[in-house]
Amino acid sequence: MEIKRLPALSDNYIFLLHDANNNTAAVVDPAVAEPVLNCLDQLGAKLIAIFNTHHHADHVGGNKKLMEQFPDLCVYGSKEDQGRIPGQQVFLEEGDTVEFAGKTGKVYFVPGHTRGHIAYYFPPNENEEIGDLFCGDTIFAGGCGRLFEGTPAQMVESIGKLRNLPDHTRIWCAHEYTLNNLKFAVTVDKDNSDLQIRYQDVIKARKNEEATVPSLLGEEKKTNPFLRWDQPALQMITGMNDPARVFGKIRGMKDNF
């Protein structure tokens, strides 16, 4: 399974999954249709599936046009998003699976950013070392999504599930927010040397107009404050120990950053 990162809108990423064996494709969170259609034209591939993580317009905006072009495709999304995702045909819950390119993806229910958010995890095959997590707006490189419909406690539980995946998991998040996320992170985790190194690397990458997605989960565990609610440095700066309260305090600080 080849993964193509397609920039869209001002800072979105759409991910096109390509099965070279039968020249079919699936797409994760098509904000708009045009980049997907252009990529499919270049590949000569047929789109057979849309995997939506949540209902926000910048994740489902391309669904309708893609369905018009490929009327046989199947649209997957959360059971909790019924009626909110255009063209949705499959309603997924925690523990469900999806199939593509000979791989089985596991569905995680990860409410917080929205009440129905899900993530798709494709573990490595026997001859692979790295798995792939499509997490929408739950985890960002260096950050996490705002809590529009959920609570800090929900988000801690959701991110906690994803945090337990193998360190060598690629995090395919849906936005290029990394530089701003790390600019905030260094203010709350000041003595984190891994974070300082990553911040400087991202500054250089963005100056060169390089993408910073995907990242690796192991790197996020070391440097992303929203995966580090149980670390003394974050507990100290918030003056709290309870995971949801630590997380909520840091999220509030980021919202006002």
UniProtKB/Swiss-Prot annotation:
> What are the binding positions for Zn(2+) 2 in this chain?
58-59, 137, 175
Keyword Zinc on this protein? yes
| Lineage start | Bacteria, Bacillati, Cyanobacteriota, Cyanophyceae, Oscillatoriophycideae
Please state the Enzyme Commission number of this protein.
3.1.2.6
Q: Which UniProt keywords apply?
A: Hydrolase, Metal-binding, Zinc
Pathway terms, separated by semicolons: Secondary metabolite metabolism; methylglyoxal degradation; (R)-lactate from methylglyoxal: step 2/2
Please give the family membership noted in the entry.
Belongs to the metallo-beta-lactamase superfamily. Glyoxalase II family.
Note describing how the cofactor binds: Binds 2 Zn(2+) ions per subunit.
Q: Which Pfam families match?
A: HAGH_C, Lactamase_B
What function does this protein fulfil? Thiolesterase that catalyzes the hydrolysis of S-D-lactoyl-glutathione to form glutathione and D-lactic acid.
Drop me one GO molecular function for this one: hydroxyacylglutathione hydrolase activity
Highest rank taxon of the organism: Bacteria
Any idea which positions bind Zn(2+) 1? Answer: 54, 56, 113, 137
The record's section on InterPro entries has: Clx_II_MBL, Glyoxalase_II_hydrolase, HAGH_C, Hydroxyacylglutathione_Hdrlase, Metallo-B-lactamas, RibonucZ/Hydroxyglut_hydro
Q: Which processes are annotated in GO (biological process)?
A: methylglyoxal catabolic process to D-lactate via S-lactoyl-glutathione
Q: Which organism does this sequence originate in?
A: Crocosphaera subtropica (strain ATCC 51142 / BH68) (Cyanothece sp. (strain ATCC 51142))
Q: Which reaction does it catalyse?
A: an S-(2-hydroxyacyl)glutathione + H2O = a 2-hydroxy carboxylate + glutathione + H(+)
NCBIfam families in alphabetical order: GSH_gloB (TIGR03413)
Task: Tell me the SMART domains matching this sequence.
Answer: Lactamase_B
Which cofactors are required for activity? Zn(2+)
Q: How does it assemble?
A: Monomer.
Name of the protein described by the UniProt record: Hydroxyacylglutathione hydrolase
